[in-house]
Amino acid sequence: MADEKNYERRIVIDPKVHFGKPCIADTRIPVENVLELIQENISFTDIVEKYYPDLEIEDIKACARYATDIVRSEEIHAELT
């Protein structure tokens, strides 16, 4: 994926917008809202056409990449039993 880090231009964190939750740039749409739609198995095309017509498919992909990077960088402290 050559554009893997391109979400950095599409996902922004602004303390004045949604209490600093990550949002899609130039919108007030939280990444969390888009991820919930993905979780409901709604296609990227339907998310753009039916829910957020101001977005592009690349914005939806950026949300998924952002979430993947957050999980990838998370430290897990599991206890072995």
Model segments located where?
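Intrinsically disordered, low-complexity and often Lys/Arg-enriched segments
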Residues: 1-7, 79-81
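A short, structured beta-strand/loop element
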Residues: 6-46
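Long, charge-rich, low-complexity alpha-helical segments
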Residues: 30-81
